[in-house]
């Protein structure tokens, strides 16, 4: 079993609209900067897990088990080295942001085991107040390997006003 890690720090959270910023990726980069990082979210080295396929998500490769394991290992390496990491999520079909699939970016800062799954804690940069954006109990992705050949990495009920599910579709290493 992997040890729990929590690098979260509410003083490092950047609320939506800080200094007039209205870009979630910029918010994520500022959070990483506050954590002492100088390189963050390198898109050329990202792991792509899912892609939109009409009104559903499909695995981005022929071997999703291997790709998810590599992406989770990347996240774990970052956390174990004391470095939070940016991930892209999908919450709405048909948005044409970024690569046509990523609707939003958040920063993973922790890992916990609940006896069944590993949960990854994240800063929700789309929030204007710290209590909602930095919430260990609510802002967490489940890494679900119940079906090992079809892993999932999601937050079933995000803190968005519509409580849309967040599916992690990209992992962006910091190096």
Predicted features along the sequence, with ranges:
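Noncatalytic regulatory segments and standalone regulatory/sensor domains
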Residues: 2-18, 38, 111-175
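Residues that form generic nucleotide/phosphate-binding pockets
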Residues: 31, 74, 78, 156, ...
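Cysteine-nucleophile protease catalytic domains, especially the papain-like/related folds used
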Residues: 1-74
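Active-site-adjacent substructure of cysteine-protease-like catalytic cores
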Residues: 68-123
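Short, flexible/disordered intra-domain loops and linkers
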Residues: 60-64, 95-101, 132-136
